[in-house]
Amino acid sequence: KFPNAKLVVHPRGARHMAEPSKLIAGVTAVYGAEYVAKMYGEILPIPAERIIEAADETTISLNGRELLCIDTPGHARHHNCIIDQQTQGIFTGDMFGLSYRELDTDGRAFIFPTTTPTQFDPDEMRASIARLLSYQPSAMYLTHFGQITDLVKLSEDLLRHISALTQ
C-alpha cells in the first residue's frame, strides 16, 4: 500500500514492530481478544529495513520540516514525543494526558493523565512533563484529543491528578 513508507519508533518498541507477538499478547491481556480484533484487525510485522529507531534527540526531516524526537517515559517506557522545530508545537502521544472539549468547564480545559496498567511510572511522567515544558512549547497536540495552549496551568492540573492517583 505504501511501499516506501518508514516507521519511526522508540528503540524499545522497534523489536515489537518487527515481531509483534508480545505486543499483541499485552494488548489482548488488557483489552480482551474481541476488542483487539475489532479495533486493530490483523496486526502484521513491519519489515526491519522499514523501521527507524528514534533514540532521544533524533531529528527526522519530513519534507524539509525538522522534527525532534524526545524520549518521554512515564505513560510507557517506550514513548517519544515529537517537537516540530518550526512551530515549537509538541505532539505528545499519550504523555501529556488526555483532554476532551466536551469535559471542559468554566472556560478551562479538562486534562487527565493516561496511565497504562502495565507501564505507568508517576515519577518518570513528572520528569517527562518538566522536560517537555523546558522546550517552551507554543502548543501541545494530544492524541486524545487536539491542541492545548494553557500549558503551565494544564501541567499543574496534570501533576495534581498524578499525585491524587498515586497516594
Regions found by a protein language model. Give the residues of each.
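Metallo-beta-lactamase
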Residues: 15-71, 77-149
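Generic beta-sheet signal
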Residues: 8-10, 92-93
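Active-site metal-binding motif and surrounding structural segment of the metallo-beta-lactamase
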Residues: 1-9
